[in-house]
């Protein structure tokens, strides 16, 4: 069926559109803010070490020109202000395509408190794993983390849905045949060390990549031994002696190429079959939605079908039980050629 949107009066439409465009601009501003990570100085220091930012790392792995669906970008917004804030909860998660396969990415942002885990960081990481588990998405972890944020460790470690659940999920997904892949692109200390160790296949970068439960200062305090990070848990140690990591990389770029090679050799079958029918643009531009939605959407009634026609392919949808339970609209439609409800 084709539905033609019923537009509200022009003065109301313009007022609504102005209001919602302002909300959209505020959202974009917030998204731009969190993408700055820990701030200009932290980013400069990060780059000076030859390290890329988490979103830059993800883009290096994705198929050229393919989209990345970032999840929970505003997690921990306006929280932990006493600690200076934790943009995006200090971790970037989302779904992207590698050799045509949708994969779940979890990338620590070391410019934000050294990539350490706050309570909301754990929650965001677990949410990404849950989505991956439900949809059988291979997981790619770009690890650059100092483990738990120690001043808040009592809120990070103890419960069944806290930090340890991350490793439990990795074990369950691996056992279920969902690939777990890691690129160690920075320090992996304490809890952060378990993520690559529990993956099915991992890559570690020479120099910046390290894996150990306790770093050189703690080793010195406990044993009196002076040891460098590289000798304690660097790329050479873990690829030639301990066997914790599987692949040695001279640079991050080489590491990301190896990650792509790993995905290419998974013999992985994507669950969803793609619809090859031609894509039809909606009959009505999405921009008009701003004018249809009332400013006070919980008080002013509007027909949600008008919104649907601006979103679905060809503005076509098949409504289900139209005369029953009329406060809810259920329908079948295609969105970018993907069939759904």
Give residue ranges: language-model regions.
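A conserved hydrophobic secondary-structure block that centers on an alpha-helix together
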Residues: 112, 118-140, 146
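Conserved catalytic cores of soluble enzyme domains
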Residues: 143-271
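Amphipathic alpha-helical
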Residues: 48-77, 281-317
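Flexible beta-alpha connector loops of hexameric P-loop NTPases
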Residues: 111-120, 152-160
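A short, small-residue-rich loop immediately preceding and capping a beta-strand
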Residues: 103-106, 114-117, 137-142, 175-188, ...
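Non-catalytic terminal/interface segments that mediate subunit docking, oligomerization
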Residues: 74-104, 124, 133, 298-341
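Terminal amphipathic helices with adjacent charged low-complexity linkers/tails
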Residues: 246-308
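N-terminal amphipathic, basic-rich helices that act as targeting or association modules
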Residues: 1-102
